[in-house]
Amino acid sequence: MTRMSPGVLAPPRELLTPEQWKQRGRDQRREVPRLSHAQWEPPLDRPDPVDILEEQARTRVPDLVPIRYGRMIASPFAYFRGAAAPMAWDLAHTPTTGIRVQACGDAHLLNFGMFAAPDRHLVFDVNDFDETLPAPFEWDVKRLAASFAVAAREQEFSDHDARTAARLTVRSYRTEMFRYATMRFLKVWYSRIDIDEVTSLFDAVQPK
């Protein structure tokens, strides 16, 4: 019989009401206040990011490593896309609430897109799970928010706009998690963003 990692298939350890989960969150916020996420100082023993990438390259196809590096040096965002491992090292030295999830592991904005669901409906969702591992939920949220900020700056938006994009990303995560907290497990499992919903959002922000 094949052994299975518990991951997201494991039943929840506790069955709490949405209000109880909210209180649990407030309690954890006292231990890890939101302001604790606003600052980051590199640890004195922080390794060179290139060394991390070189260590990672040992497990890759040798002929493809130079191609990967060539793509990463094209721009700051291209480097960010390829540098999930160095960022994971940095995130491992940041505050967390201890809430672990089956993380995407590389939740930058270009790892979201459209694809056909099993029922052939077009949906918008995470489309890359090759780095997935159990990890603190904050890591995915921070990498996603950072990706919007880096992309905004690369496109020559102002620092204010870049911060706004990151803030709205985190706000959207928070509001959706609040909505999911009021839903039953199967309702959450089958929840999805249909392409018509995405199209309407884009249409709403287009200049008239």
Where are these regions (language model features)?
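Short acidic, low-complexity intrinsically disordered linear motifs used
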Residues: 14-33
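Low-complexity, highly charged intrinsically disordered N-terminal segments
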Residues: 32-78, 82-85
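Catalytic activation segment of kinase domains across protein kinase-like and atypical kinase folds
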Residues: 98-104, 108-155, 163, 172
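General secondary-structure propensity
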Residues: 6-16
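Contiguous mid-protein beta-loop-alpha structural module that forms a pocket-lining wall or clamp
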Residues: 149-208
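Active-site-flanking structural segment that lines cofactor/substrate pockets
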Residues: 80-92, 96
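Conserved aromatic-histidine-acidic binding/catalytic patches
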Residues: 13, 68-75, 95, 99, ...
